[in-house]
Amino acid sequence: MARYTGPSWKVSRRLGISLSGTGKELERRPYAPGQHGPTQRKKISEYGLQQAEKQKLRHMYGLTERQFKNTFNKAGKLQGKHGENFMILLEQRLDNIVYRLGLARTRRAARQLVNHGHITVDGKRVDIPSYQVSVGQVISVREKSAKNSAIAESLEVSSFVPEYVTFDAEKLTGSLNRLPERSELAAEINEAFIVEFYSR
């Protein structure tokens, strides 16, 4: 399944989550596209709930089905809770860390920064969005990209940086100083549904 590249607001309204990070797309019309007003939806089956939860998280991080499933399988080989490990692995993706540092306003924009070679890891350019960032690694904006307008605009509006990352706005460098705890990740996601979905 290819990565969705259409309007994010449509997916946000269909799944009931904000993919832009602002929540604005849900303020005016907090119901699915195609509905003529906030009419009551049909009752969803257990399978439907599980699938919807999977789609929420997949679109949140902007992954293809194959990338999502591969990461899920990788999480299953780690010690601890499968669902929590899965969410932590998603959070360790380079494009996500770039987003968390405030260098991009959305994960989609962060993915483009990585793809276009604007980001380095420990001084070496990395253009793979799925690269898994380890604790202690230094993420930086390339010197040639320091005046990138998209980065500058994002830094102007970004204020919240999670406690598990550190960022130096003057040097445009940051790092993952520890793995996140479950309580610091998306509260609107029930990862148990996703584990159940793939266990069918």
From Swiss-Prot:
Organism: Listeria monocytogenes serotype 4a (strain HCC23)
Name of the gene: rpsD
Function noted in UniProt: One of the primary rRNA binding proteins, it binds directly to 16S rRNA where it nucleates assembly of the body of the 30S subunit. With S5 and S12 plays an important role in translational accuracy.
Taxonomic superkingdom: Bacteria
Subunit structure: Part of the 30S ribosomal subunit. Contacts protein S5. The interaction surface between S4 and S5 is involved in control of translational fidelity.
GO MF term (any one): structural constituent of ribosome
Family: Belongs to the universal ribosomal protein uS4 family.
Name this protein carries in UniProt: Small ribosomal subunit protein uS4
Any GO CC annotation of this UniProt entry: small ribosomal subunit
Domain S4 RNA-binding: start-end pairs: 92-170
